Design a protein with these regions (language model features):
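Membrane-embedded alpha-helical bundles of multi-pass transporters/translocases
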Residues: 2-544
């Protein structure tokens, strides 16, 4: 791919340098770090803002709906934007500034105001935060067409994106969360009685959340406000660095000559409605991606992971170990799949292979959970990335169990198949943008990106509510379960429903949606030839 010319004017193909795609993909990781930060916000709302568990989950859903509502408006602005700084890069800058400012206010300011003001201020801060999130997120989709329109190069974005997300989501974050962050900020009355008393005095709702074990009161780190202030500064700083890399990656290609037909276009609301009604590609992609995202958000929810490893398997630290052990194999299989399937057979085929593979792995993993639940027979070595001496635990076979080994093997393929189905949808939005140029002559990347995000956020916003409601049904109505919660049959089946049941529904939606998705590899080659012709005619007309 690196030996191909950056432009093939006869075929209307323009390509990006490989490093440009890699840097551009950092923008998606930048916003995903904020998603990780806010992924456990229900704990903060319960402990610090003072809401009940179900209400905290519902607030997350309501605010995600607001998140979706802002998308079409931002998309319209993107499609009308053409500055000296480009069409897309200004939105990274604006979004990043708002994200840091509002998240700082949420986690550093709120704990220091009166209880009566916390919830109203949280709503204000979060509404503004969402606008920033939308501004930066839209660029991940809207800039895809101007970066490259080569169908064989677009999956490279998914390859970089998968590497970044696997390393962060599967490797660094679980180990950091379960092995460092939560243990560091978990307090017990034997050692931190005065600190717990001070936090309860400042945040009265924490009194109902303290767990007693062997006569010692424990405040889980998820409910410690100091954890959130540190977490925000860490994620905000990393996100800023990644956003800068994303801007650099777009620098050469974020210009008018790479926008659609290469000239100015007036986009109206009527055009948007026509796209919604007739672009079958984006319709089916939205159905597939949104159902998948709902399931993924529910499965990866902090409460679900804490219960699965801390309560059902019996050792929360094993979450980080499993993630660390599986990361490299998952990464290698994912990259191989994107290279051999997405680039050679098409992105649609890649999504379907990932879907069927995920479903098969999930069925087998359910049996492992049922066989291991609360029996003390699930074991994998625990180790710390900061303590080299603990790496030897991996070769201590006494720390491995059969169920632990089976889980590791299945988790590798489960993760790889999940990445194939989930990460390929972003470059697929670029195909839908080109399909719209082919279908109607309109170049509306902002609409494609924000329409995708709108429905995606609207549906996936149900995840916190579903997690809260399902756990409330088995006895956790006042607070979400943590790794310190007691085991019960109810908590077992609630976790299975969230970790496996909801994803299964999403995978079935994938299969149905892809039956009607028109953009195969062969179709995209035809589309690029027609788009090149449309662009050439438009440029000749502009010169005349």
């Amino acid at each position: 791919m690196s030996k191909l010319p950056l432009e093939d004017k006869e075929k209307g193909i323009h390509r990006a340098k490989i490093w440009e795609i890699g840097f551009y993909a950092c923008n998606n990781l930048s916003t995903n770090l904020y998603m990780l930060l806010m992924g456990s916000i229900s704990y903060y709302l319960i402990g610090i803002v003072g809401l009940g568990a179900v209400l905290a989950g519902s607030i997350g859903t309501i605010m995600r709906i607001w998140d979706g509502v802002t998308d079409p408006f931002v998309g319209l602005i993107v499609d009308k934007t053409d500055t000296k700084f480009g069409k897309n890069r200004p939105f990274i800058v604006i979004g990043q500034a708002i994200l840091f400012g509002m998240s700082f206010a949420m986690f550093h300011v709120l704990p220091n105001v009166s209880m009566s003001m916390r919830f109203p201020l949280y709503i204000v801060f979060y509404c503004l935060y969402i606008i920033g999130y939308t501004c930066q997120c839209v660029v991940t989709k809207s800039a895809q067409p101007c970066l490259t329109n080569d169908p064989s190069q677009r999956p490279i974005f998914a390859m970089f994106d998968s590497v970044y997300l696997i390393v962060v989501f599967n490797f660094w974050y679980p180990i950091f969360l379960s092995g460092t962050l939560i243990p560091k900020y978990t307090l017990n009355s034997a050692q931190h009685a005065d600190k717990i008393a001070a936090l309860v005095a400042q945040n009265p709702n924490l009194a109902n959340i303290l767990i007693e074990k062997d006569g010692v009161q424990i405040l889980n780190g998820f409910y410690n406000p100091e954890m959130w202030t540190y977490f925000q500064l860490l994620m905000g700083g990393l996100s800023f660095i990644l956003a800068v890399l994303g801007i650099i990656g777009l620098w050469r290609k974020d210009r008018k000559e790479y926008f659609g037909v290469g000239n100015d276009q007036k986009v109206t609301v009527h055009d948007y409605l026509d796209v919604l009604a007739h672009n079958r590609g984006i319709q089916m992609l939205v159905v597939s991606a949104s159902s998948d995202k709902l399931a993924a958000n529910a499965r990866s929810n902090s409460a679900v992971m804490a219960v699965l490893f801390g309560v059902i398997f019996g050792n929360y630290a094993m979450q980080g170990s499993v993630s660390a052990i599986t990361t490299i194999p998952v990464l290698l299989i994912t990259l191989l799949a994107f290279n051999q399937i997405a680039r050679k057979l098409g992105q649609k085929k890649c999504l379907l292979v990932g879907t069927y593979g995920s479903l098969a792995c999930a069925v087998l993993m359910i049996f492992v959970v049922l066989a291991s639940a609360n029996k003390g027979i699930f074991s994998v070595p625990t180790f710390s990335l900061t303590k080299i001496a603990t790496f030897g635990n991996l070769f201590d076979f006494s720390q491995w169990s059969l169920m632990g080994l089976l889980w590791i093997v299945l988790a590798i393929f489960f993760g790889a198949f999940g990445n194939m189905a989930g990460n390929i949808v972003i470059p697929m939005t670029a195909d839908c943008t080109d399909y719209e140029v082919y279908r109607s002559g309109r170049y509306v990347p902002g609409l494609m990106g924000t329409l995708f995000s709108f429905v995606d956020k609207l549906i996936s916003s149900l995840a916190p509510t579903l997690v809260s409601v399902i756990y409330a049904m088995v006895g956790f109505s006042n607070a979400l379960p943590t790794n310190d919660s007691p085991y019960s049959t109810g908590i077992l089946w609630a976790t299975i429903a969230l970790y496996f049941g909801m994803p299964a529904i999403g995978w079935l939606c994938n299969v149905v949606a892809m039956k009607f998705y028109p953009l195969t590899k062969e179709k995209m080659e035809e589309i690029q030839e027609e788009v090149a012709r449309i662009k050439l005619e438009a440029q000749k007309g502009a010169k005349a």
